[in-house]
């Protein structure tokens, strides 16, 4: 049990709709992350999907959080959606190195979110494995059901890449997939309404049981951040997992 760590957070921290529920009304937005990091121990940064943060921004994030806080960074859409992993490994490495320079020990790893049109083939599997930088922890979230198979889990495990489980309003399994001995990753997007639906306490209790049975490090992120469902669910799961 001593090696077990659970990191819980949301896919972002700057949600204005949380003001009055999570953030105090008088709290300036520049202090949001510091306040957030006092309540939760991880955040998934989705803004990097659209633009690369400056070193100043990354350093500010690092200084605003405690020693045990972790950031998970989404890989840019130019890599995953526009070029569809038809990239050189150096492109990924350059981005990852830029992020690591600013976040240092606060960097948890990198999330590759792939589009629904990116289906399983042996060629695409190789693209995934060749796109990651093995110097970092890499997680892949697929959006097509063809990736949910044991061969994929096995190949990714051999390369040290984590398969992200997902709760999403699509015909995709919401099972918590554990394909790595040391790391578990799960994203909750809201069901039945994407980004909007709140998970019930009973659903979170089941998830907590799964997390607590895993002896490695778990990363759980709520992306149902339209309004307060995500932050509410994250705080509830934190209590259940303590």
Please report, for each region that a protein language model flagged, where it lies by residue.
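Residues lining hydrophobic/aromatic ligand-binding pockets adjacent to catalytic sites
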Residues: 1-242
């Amino acid at each position: 049990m001593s090696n077990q760590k659970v990191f819980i957070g949301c896919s972002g921290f700057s949600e204005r709709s949380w003001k009055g529920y999570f953030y105090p009304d008088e709290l300036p937005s520049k202090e949001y992350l510091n306040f957030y990091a006092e309540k939760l121990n991880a955040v998934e940064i989705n803004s990097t999907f659209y633009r690369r943060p400056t070193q100043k921004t990354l350093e500010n994030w690092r200084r605003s959080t405690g020693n045990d806080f972790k950031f998970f960074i989404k890989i840019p859409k130019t890599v995953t959606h526009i070029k569809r992993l038809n990239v050189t490994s150096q492109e990924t490495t350059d981005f990852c190195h830029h992020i690591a320079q600013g976040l240092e020990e606060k960097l948890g790893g990198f999330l590759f979110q792939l589009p629904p049109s990116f289906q399983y083939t042996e060629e695409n599997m190789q693209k995934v494995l060749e796109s990651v930088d093995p110097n970092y922890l890499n997680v892949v979230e697929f959006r097509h059901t063809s990736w949910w198979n044991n061969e994929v889990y096995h190949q990714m495990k051999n390369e040290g890449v984590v398969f992200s489980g997902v709760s999403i309003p699509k015909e995709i399994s919401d099972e918590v997939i554990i394909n790595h001995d040391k790391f578990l990753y799960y994203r909750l997007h809201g069901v039945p309404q994407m980004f909007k639906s709140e998970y019930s306490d009973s659903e979170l209790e089941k998830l907590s049981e799964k997390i607590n049975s895993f002896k490695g490090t778990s990363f759980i992120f709520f992306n149902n951040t339209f309004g307060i469902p995500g932050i509410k669910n994250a705080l509830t799961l934190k209590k259940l997992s303590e």
